[in-house]
UniProtKB/Swiss-Prot annotation:
An example Gene Ontology CC term for this record: cytoplasm
Protein's recorded name: Protein RPN4
GO biological process annotation, one example: regulation of DNA repair
UniProt feature, compositional bias: Basic residues: 394-407
Length: 531
């Protein structure tokens, strides 16, 4: 077998063993250490330093004696240091940092290699080329690689990076150019300089403060002034109160009555204009009429009447808690209310049809008009002596008129809700926005109406389906039966949630599992009672 193939079988154990006993190239040692030593054919033959010692076999007793007499003078220690220990396939000298002194090299040179070469393999060993090794001692440029390098600088070292060296990073997130201030410090862009004299004996805090001075001036004085002005303007807008209904600038009632009578019936089509925004149309109509008919009035009164134009938040729907349909009254609305024409009465439906809720918006509008006509919410208004008195009186009349219209509209809607159920089953009464549903089913025992009241129609329906059902389902409490016997059996519950409340209140000492058992017993033993 070729010597190169044999050299592949040298293991790491052999290498560590040689290093442990300070083996030197070309020598064998500790022959007598292995009592029953036999040459290992797998060990790679090496080039010996002294070829006359190739086939020598020594015992441990006279090996040391031979070391004192051997070829220390024939080969100098410097030459033995450069001989390789291993072949090219397992050369650990690439990472070795062992340095030999003269005494160590002389002592190691006296050692004897314990490898017995086969004569046929000597030629192959001599032809194995020597590998060029790399020593960490030369790479690290230090006397001792295991001694950590010490900082020999007597001043602080500034650490930075090359972030600002890249031109793409000169813009921040707010699209503003960095370093536009006059106190820009270019030392921020310096790279790591260990031997730079420019930063010698500088304090780290001083460097930091000088580098980041511009951060304190991110917001200029002009921007601060603008922010303060905006805040003051917002506070002023928030502090402005909403115009109350007492100052509503509508003076339609103070106009001449003859003007309304002379108008044609075609204006009735525009009598009620339903909108969902503000009262701009009211103010525009009123302002035009005032300019035509009352040009002699003062400018102060006109400014007072036009205050509503400046407030878009105002809405008639603010009269109630919830938003309702707001409507606009034209100038001649009141005159047509006082003197209804035949066409008006023909277009307005009777109040008997308002019992049911109409899906169309026009029908609900007509019901509002009819209610206002029958109730007679408006009175004849005398013409005031002054414009100020007439405007105040007209505003009060408009408020009363609007409130009555809205209340009649809400009462009509509330009265139409319970019409879905049979009238004999229950009745409902409206108290403002709160509706009360009353059960009117006759009690067979007392021969009187039940009279149970509920705030929701759902509760009333559930009451009638359970209490007044012909065949009622009842639940019994097993704990009451155990304690009271027949009296506890007579105690029944129409709903399961009532039984649950009974268990929590009357049987507080029961655990959760025991309560579940009582509920299961009630479900399994449902009773029926004929009503």
């Amino acid at each position: 077998m070729a010597s190169t193939e044999l050299s592949l079988k040298r293991t790491l154990t052999d290498i560590l063993e040689d290093e442990l006993y300070h083996t030197n190239p070309g020598h064998s040692q500790f022959t007598s250490h292995y009592q029953n030593y036999h040459p290992n054919a797998s060990i790679t033959p090496y080039k010996l330093v002294n070829k006359n010692k190739e086939n020598n076999t020594f015992t441990w007793n006279h090996s040391l004696q031979h070391q004192n007499e051997s070829s220390a003078a024939s080969i100098p220690p410097q030459q033995t240091y450069h001989f390789p220990i291993f072949n090219k396939y397992a050369d650990p000298t690439l990472t070795t940092t062992t340095s030999f002194t003269t005494s160590e090299a002389t002592a190691n040179d006296r050692q004897i290699n314990n490898v017995h070469l086969i004569p046929n393999e000597i030629k192959g060993a001599s032809e194995t080329p020597l590998q060029k090794t790399v020593n960490l001692k030369n790479i690290m440029k230090v006397s001792d690689p295991y001694v950590p390098t010490r900082n020999t600088f007597n001043y602080d070292v500034k650490i930075s990076n090359d972030f600002f060296d890249n031109g793409d990073n000169l813009y921040g997130n707010d699209e503003e150019v960095l370093f536009y201030e006059d106190n820009y410090n270019p030392k921020m862009q310096w790279s790591l300089q260990d031997n730079s004299a420019a930063i010698n004996n500088e304090d780290a805090r001083a460097i930091f403060n000088n580098e980041f001075d511009s951060d304190d001036d991110d917001i200029s004085d002009d921007e601060e002034d603008e922010i303060e002005e905006n805040c003051l303007q917002q506070e002023q807008h928030q502090e402005e109160p909403l115009l109350s209904l007492d100052v509503t600038p509508i003076s339609m009632f103070g106009s001449d009555q003859k003007t309304g009578r002379a108008k044609s019936s075609s204006h009735l089509f525009n009598e009620y204009s339903y909108v969902d925004s503000n009262m701009d149309s009211i103010s525009s109509v009123v302002s035009e009429d005032l300019l035509d008919e009352r040009g002699h009035e003062k400018i102060e009164d006109e400014d007072e009447d036009n205050d509503l134009d400046e407030d878009d938040i105002y809405d008639i729907s603010l009269l109630k808690n919830r938003r309702k349909q707001s409507f606009v009254l034209n100038k001649n609305t009141i005159d047509f209310e006082r003197f209804p024409s035949p066409s008006t009465s023909a277009n307005v439906p009777s109040t008997a049809t308002t019992g049911k809720r109409k899906p169309a918006k026009s029908s609900s509008n007509r019901s509002c008009v009819s209610n206002s006509n029958e109730n007679g919410t408006l009175e004849r208004i005398k013409k005031p002596t002054s414009a100020v008195v007439s405007s105040n009186a007209s505003r009060r009349k408009l408020i009363n008129y609007t409130k009555k219209h809205l209340s009649s509209h809400s009462s009509t809607n509330s009265n139409s809700k319970p019409s879905t159920a049979s009238p004999s089953a229950h009745t409902s009464s409206s108290d403002g926005n709160n509706e009360i549903f009353t059960c009117q089913i006759m009690n067979l025992i007392t021969n009187e109406p039940c009279g149970a009241q509920f705030s929701r129609s759902y509760d009333l329906t559930r009451h009638q389906n359970t209490i007044h059902a012909k065949r009622k389902i009842v639940f019994r409490c097993s704990e009451c039966i155990k304690i009271l016997g027949s009296e506890g059996y007579q105690k029944t519950f129409s709903r399961l949630d009532a039984l649950t409340r009974h268990i929590k209140s009357k049987h507080e000492d029961l655990s959760l599992e025991q309560r579940q058992e009582v509920t299961k017993f009630a479900k399994a033993n449902i009773g029926y009672v004929m009503g």
